[in-house]
């Protein structure tokens, strides 16, 4: 499925590119915005899971906390996915980080959510995740790093432990692993997703979706996977 919704990617020079398939795109926006030919295969790694861990279908999201189109997916798409598939036990969402270099605080925001998780569990991770997207300014421009320990405090976490974790860069390599795995399957911007049948070894082979797609695009693929196709 090619990109039917906007997403942010890196150009060859490392600058931001907003890709959109409709109209007359600029030369920069004509850089590849779709998916590799054929299915892709990627691990869920040890990343946080939202929903039933034994769900038959896995949705892996590669996302950036400062990406405006990731925020759009958070506000528009995620509630529909939760209502129809995640909360009903049919789909589990695995969140993997893909912080783009031109978003100044995205890397540390990704590490911060992992620091929150390390004190508790996946549920706490997604509470932290939700707060970053909810509190980010219109357009998803992210938060000041000083706001991250405030979120941690509001979630009942040990703030000193959280700040030490964040300052140490404990999860820098974890975030880099997510980036490397995404890049290996052709992810070049956010949000990007892989939908496939769940597997015992955590290797998900499935469809790569790029951009802030509507719920209908996900529904069509998820229903196919649920029907064993």
Question: Over which residues does each language-model region extend?
Answer:
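Short coil-to-helix leader/linker segments, especially the first N-terminal amphipathic alpha-helix
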Residues: 28-43
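Structural alpha/beta surface segment adjacent to cysteine/selenocysteine redox centers
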Residues: 55, 60-153, 185-188
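Conserved short-loop catalytic and cofactor-binding motifs
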Residues: 47, 100, 136, 163, ...
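A generic local structural motif
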Residues: 44-47, 78-80, 179-180
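A short beta-strand-turn-helix
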Residues: 40-57
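Generic, ordered loop/turn and secondary-structure boundary motif
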Residues: 49-51, 99-101, 210
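C-terminal cap of thioredoxin/glutaredoxin-like
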Residues: 1-30, 62, 76, 149-229
């Amino acid at each position: 499925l090619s990109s039917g919704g906007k997403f942010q990617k890196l150009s060859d020079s490392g600058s931001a590119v907003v890709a959109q398939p409709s109209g007359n795109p600029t030369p920069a926006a004509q850089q590849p915005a779709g998916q590799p030919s054929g299915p892709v295969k990627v691990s869920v790694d040890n990343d946080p899971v939202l929903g039933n861990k034994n769900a038959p279908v896995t949705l892996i999201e590669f996302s950036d906390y400062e990406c405006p189109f990731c925020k759009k997916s958070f506000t528009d798409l995620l509630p529909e996915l939760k209502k129809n598939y995640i909360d009903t036990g049919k789909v589990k969402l695995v969140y993997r980080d893909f912080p783009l270099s031109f978003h100044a605080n995205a890397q540390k925001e990704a590490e911060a959510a992992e620091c929150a998780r390390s004190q508790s569990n996946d549920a706490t991770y997604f509470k932290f995740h939700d707060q970053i997207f909810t509190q980010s300014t219109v357009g998803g421009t992210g938060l000041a790093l000083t706001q991250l320990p405030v979120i941690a405090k509001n979630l009942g976490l040990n703030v000193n432990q959280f700040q030490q974790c964040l300052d140490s860069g404990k999860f820098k390599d974890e975030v880099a692993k997510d980036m490397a795995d995404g890049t290996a399957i052709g992810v070049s911007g956010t949000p990007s997703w892989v939908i496939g049948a769940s597997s015992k070894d955590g290797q998900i082979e499935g469809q790569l979706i790029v951009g802030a797609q509507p719920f209908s695009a996900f529904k069509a693929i998820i229903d196919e996977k649920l029907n064993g196709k």
